[in-house]
UniProtKB/Swiss-Prot annotation:
The record marks 334 as: Transition state stabilizer. The gene is rbcL. Substrate binds at residues 123, 173, 177, 295, 327, 379. GO terms for biological process: photorespiration; reductive pentose-phosphate cycle. Heterohexadecamer of 8 large chains and 8 small chains; disulfide-linked. The disulfide link is formed within the large subunit homodimers. The lineage of its organism: Eukaryota, Viridiplantae, Streptophyta, Embryophyta, Tracheophyta. It comes from Ostrya virginiana. This is Ribulose bisphosphate carboxylase large chain.
Length: 475
């Protein structure tokens, strides 16, 4: 070894492995307004102290690696490293705790959810020192959120485009989700829209399969939309699913939808990916298309309480990436969703400023500044008897989507749509008159059914249907 090499090796660098907590656990750190803050639920392996586990999360999701490297000396770790600045126990769980980590803004590419998630929820989730790891919440600073376009249009612009105010919007997923020909599919769309719905929807699985190619579906659905609009005098839409195997094909489908003059397209944002979703959102804003977002695959990521990522984080990511609607659970239907937690991330989707509220699972105050809001979509196992609860829980700025609750009507699709529209109008009128939907909901629906035979038939069919299972998503 030359003298020069010896000198370099002996100054400022010592090879080997050292505890993460010596560098990345900084309890005295005061967070900056520009930091991205994360709350992780950490379950360390037996014998791993909380401070070491929390510091390991901060290190492995930012600048750290398993051993000391000499190139650390070529940059400023103090400027770029993530910091575990606070640790707190999880009530009722001996082996779990919440680790709060602050990330400097310069770690992330502007306008890229893909890059942000690659760091924060990347390889660290496979780290052997941890038995499980879950990202519960993120605080996105205005300095970062302002680098995103966000939703193509937002709630107010959508209402202005549709000329619909003062009530939730009504939708319906066409069933059976797979197997219909394009012409029969378009017929079902027409019947539902003519009956009083604002939107119909492609199921998330419907892309371009042998039984129904995308171009045929788009054409027959456009015909249905224009026919229903002419008959009802209302603006109608169908969520044409542009999700495809490549970004180029996805954009091609969105271009065709725009050329048909329809108001809205759709994307499966998790299976399609954030890069594709952001690209489509940009196209939709530039070309006047609304963008409906389905969350297929979310439960793979968010349903386990100890590992993965909570949906409130996926909801924030979607607001940044871009979408005008997103499915957000129902509280009362067949899909997972506890009331206060669901309302917590619904507010994160719609509101400009959301205060920290741990009772609703919100770990950080979130200021979206001018990023447009997203309409939450309640969908999955809901029917006319749920209408009072849905109207009370979600309020006007929402989309209530009845698939089987429309198409399962004993008299057909159009009467099913009529039943839902009558039930909604009755609930909105009762609420505006000061009645309590939570207490008087069934009475309101029964009264409306007396002058709507379609609603009366729907009430009879679904009077015994319930989905009563304990929610997995609890605090």
């Amino acid at each position: 070894m030359s003298p020069q090499t010896e000198t370099k090796a002996s100054v400022g660098f010592k090879a080997g492995v050292k505890d993460y907590k010596l560098t990345y656990h900084t309890p005295d750190y005061e967070t900056k307004d520009t930091d991205i803050l994360a709350a992780f639920r950490v379950t360390p392996q037996p014998g791993v102290p909380p401070e070491e586990a929390g510091a390991a999360v901060a290190a492995e999701s930012s600048t750290g690696t398993w051993t000391t490297v000499w190139t650390d000396g070529l940059t400023s770790l103090d400027r770029y490293k993530g910091r575990c600045y606070h640790i707190e126990p999880v009530a009722g769980e001996e082996s779990q705790f919440i680790a709060y980590v602050a990330y400097p803004l310069d770690l992330f590419e502007e306008g890229s959810v893909t890059n942000m998630f690659t760091s924060i929820v990347g390889n660290v989730f496979g780290f052997k020192a941890l038995r499980a790891l879950r990202l519960e919440d993120l605080r996105i600073p205005p300095a970062y959120s302002k680098t995103f376009q966000g939703p193509p249009h937002g709630i107010q612009v959508e209402r202005d485009k549709l000329n619909k105010y003062g009530r939730p919007l009504l939708g319906c997923t066409i069933k059976p989700k797979l197997g219909l020909s394009a012409k029969n599919y378009g017929r079902a769309v027409y019947e539902c829209l003519r009956g009083g719905l604002d939107f119909t929807k492609d199921d998330e699985n419907v892309n371009s399969q042998p039984f129904m190619r995308w171009r045929d579906r788009f054409l027959f659905c456009a015909e249905a939309i224009y026919k229903a609009q002419a008959e009802t005098g209302e603006i109608k839409g169908h969520y044409l699913n542009a999700t495809a195997g490549t970004c180029e094909e996805m954009i091609k489908r969105a271009v065709f939808a725009r050329e048909l003059g329809v108001p809205i397209v759709m994307h499966d944002y998790l299976t399609g990916g954030f890069t594709a979703n952001t690209s489509l959102a940009h196209y939709c804003r530039d070309n006047g298309l609304l963008l409906h977002i389905h969350r297929a695959m979310h439960a793979v990521i968010d349903r386990q309480k100890n590992h993965g990522m909570h949906f409130r984080v996926l909801a924030k990511a979607l607001r940044m990436s871009g979408g005008d609607h997103i499915h957000a659970g129902t509280v009362v239907g067949k899909l997972e969703g506890e009331r206060e937690i669901t309302l917590g991330f619904v507010d994160l989707l719609r509101d400009d400023y959301i205060e920290k509220d741990r009772s609703r699972g919100i770990y950080f105050t979130q200021d979206w500044v001018s990023l447009p809001g997203v309409l939450p979509v309640a969908s999955g196992g809901i029917h006319v008897w749920h209408m009072p609860a849905l109207t009370e829980i979600f309020g006007d700025d929402s989309v209530l989507q009845f698939g089987g609750g429309t198409l399962g009507h004993p008299w057909g699709n159009a009467p099913g749509a009529v039943a839902n529209r009558v039930a909604l109008e009755a609930c909105v009128q009762a609420r505006n008159e000061g009645r309590d939907l939570a207490c008087e909901g069934n009475e309101i629906i029964r009264a409306a059914a007396k002058w709507s035979p379609e609603l009366a038939a729907a009430c009879e069919v679904w009077k015994e249907i319930k989905f009563e299972f304990p929610a997995m998503d609890t605090l």
